[in-house]
Amino acid sequence: MRVLVVEDELLIRYAIAETLGLAGHTVIEADNGAAAVRALTNSAEAVDVVMLDYRLPDSNDLTLLAAIRRLSPQSGVILMTAHGTPEVRHGALDLGAYEVMHKPFELHDLEPLLLKAFAASGPSQSTPHTPAGWRP
């Protein structure tokens, strides 16, 4: 499974990426919203699941989640937050996030949640996609 981890805290991003990599997943890392958008638009293969931090240096609302859902509608999205409120949770779910995961969390909880998000994300998982603007 291809997983995009969008997290500005280096140690958290590293721990998630390492855990998922050891579980056999291909992990793409981004430390801000712009890097996440680039990763989604420049990737030759579809991203199956996006693990997205709610508060990033260049995005601290649900705008980035909406952009990710437009760019990669086949990807399951798990929103990670240490500042979760019921409004954030409902807004994220309304925009198509699979789940809102509250920090801190246990790394061993990632794999089952990732698999559920992957299973719920739709039929076009793990298939190549066409980057925006590309024409044969």
What function would you assign to each model-found segment?
Residues 87, 105-115:
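C-terminal output helix
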Residues 32, 60-63:
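Acidic catalytic/metal-coordinating carboxylates
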Residues 29-49:
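Acidic, metal-coordinating helix/loop segments flanking the phosphotransfer/catalytic sites
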Residues 63, 84-99:
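Alpha4 helix (beta4-alpha4-beta5 surface) of REC/receiver domains from two-component response regulators
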